[in-house]
Amino acid sequence: MEYETVKVSKENKVATIEINRPYLLNAFNTQLILDLQQATKFVKDDNDIRVVIISGSGRAFSSGADLTEEDSGWDGSKDALIRGFKPSFENIISMPKPFIASIKGPAAGI
């Protein structure tokens, strides 16, 4: 699968989701949120995958929300959490596979 802000690879039944916005320390913008929704659904639904690793490219896992994004399309923080992040979290929580976070550098909240 091809995404704008995440890389997904699969090798030996292990999938890796790499957040790929290193120039902004992998800050979460709208596109990253949508790509992460699709990527987590893809690895959840692929029965050949047994383990999932999520990491960040560059020197940080994530610096949190992208404060430079002017029009996110969300109607406030609550809407971003419900429509944006919740589907990804639900994919991860309901996934019957180990989901490992490989964190280096900053890992800030959203």
Show where each model-derived region lies:
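Histidine-centered beta-alpha loop that forms part of the nucleotide-sugar donor binding/catalytic region
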Residues: 20, 65, 104
